[in-house]
């Protein structure tokens, strides 16, 4: 009495678990509860989008409305990542019939705010949310850290995936604005197309400079010191991968121009960055931060392997195709 409304968490708090033999009759049994009680529900599985079908499912099976339990921005399923991206993986337009919604955050209190800002907007009004998702995401940085808004957004655009996730097989959106350019440049490299003065290659090199500058600006000028401390492992990882991409592209260009010294020097920079990329401890004693894991690091890894395979044979002193000035 006097405790309404209550929200109850069943053992089978998602569609998959509710169908296990041990939980098969649980939702049906819940029909006997007071009608005011809502049910904690994570959707089709443990970490799932908010869909109309799953909201209807729990209502039909239990007779109660769902209080949607969204497992975001918690990163327990992929601790090498920290989630600063948009929430389009979870958001669906116009879902009705929920009693409410709650977020399961990570232990990174300051970094959680990017996701929580967006979830608050979604929970307040989910009509046509997808049309406004990008704007809401960008607004978060202006609201949270206005003194480094642009730099924070640049960082977040490349630090949002959930690497090696046990729950989200295809990962979260990350580096989407570079997706086409990365693919095109990689194709040019593999096909032997001329790289010097290529507009896409130069654009990608310039973007890596901007990422490195954003990291430096954020570290120096963000007034939220706790935020900087939380993100520092991922900032170091992102700085490495951006530095590495710039260097390996310069190396590939030099390789085509028969400049062995330039090719080798930049290759060394890229290889070192690639080796350091996932060596920064996130604070739990074991897990290492992985920034740019969806597109940037795979690109760096593949181009580094390509340059190595083409550069190493030319370091043979008997080879006359190159004239290494450092001999």
Regions found by a protein language model. Name each.
Residues 1-136:
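Catalytic-core regions of glycoside hydrolase
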Residues 133-326:
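Catalytic domains of carbohydrate-active enzymes that cleave complex glycans
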């Amino acid at each position: 009495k006097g405790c309404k409304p209550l929200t109850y968490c069943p053992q089978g708090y998602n569609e998959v678990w509710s169908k296990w033999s041990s939980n098969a009759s649980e939702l049906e049994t819940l029909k006997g509860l007071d009608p005011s009680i809502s049910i904690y529900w994570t959707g089709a599985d443990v970490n799932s989008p908010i869909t109309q079908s799953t909201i209807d499912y729990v209502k039909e099976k239990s007779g109660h409305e769902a209080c949607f339990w969204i497992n975001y921005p918690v990163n327990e399923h992929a601790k090498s990542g920290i989630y600063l991206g948009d929430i389009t993986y979870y958001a669906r337009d116009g879902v009705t019939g929920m009693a409410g919604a709650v977020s399961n955050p990570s232990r990174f209190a300051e970094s959680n705010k990017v996701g929580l800002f967006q979830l608050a907007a979604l929970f307040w009004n989910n009509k046509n949310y997808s049309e406004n998702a990008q704007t809401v995401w960008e607004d978060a940085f202006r609201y949270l850290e206005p003194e480094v808004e642009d730099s924070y957004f640049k960082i977040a655009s490349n630090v949002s995936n959930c690497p090696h996730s046990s729950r989200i097989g295809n990962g979260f959106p990350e580096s989407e604005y570079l997706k086409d350019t990365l693919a095109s440049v990689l194709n040019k490299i593999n096909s032997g197309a001329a790289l010097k003065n290529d507009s896409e290659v130069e654009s990608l090199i310039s973007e890596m400079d901007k990422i490195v500058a954003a990291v430096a600006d954020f570290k120096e000028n963000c007034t939220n010191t706790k935020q900087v401390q939380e993100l520092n492992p991922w900032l170091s990882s992102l700085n490495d991968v951006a530095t590495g991409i710039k260097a390996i592209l310069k190396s590939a260009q030099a390789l085509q121009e028969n400049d062995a010294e330039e090719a080798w020097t930049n290759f060394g920079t890229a290889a070192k960055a690639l080796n350091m990329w996932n060596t920064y401890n996130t604070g739990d004693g074991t897990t290492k931060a992985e920034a740019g894991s969806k597109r940037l690091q795979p690109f760096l890894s593949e181009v580094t392997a390509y340059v190595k395979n083409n550069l190493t044979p030319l370091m043979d002193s008997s080879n006359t195709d190159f004239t290494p000035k450092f001999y």
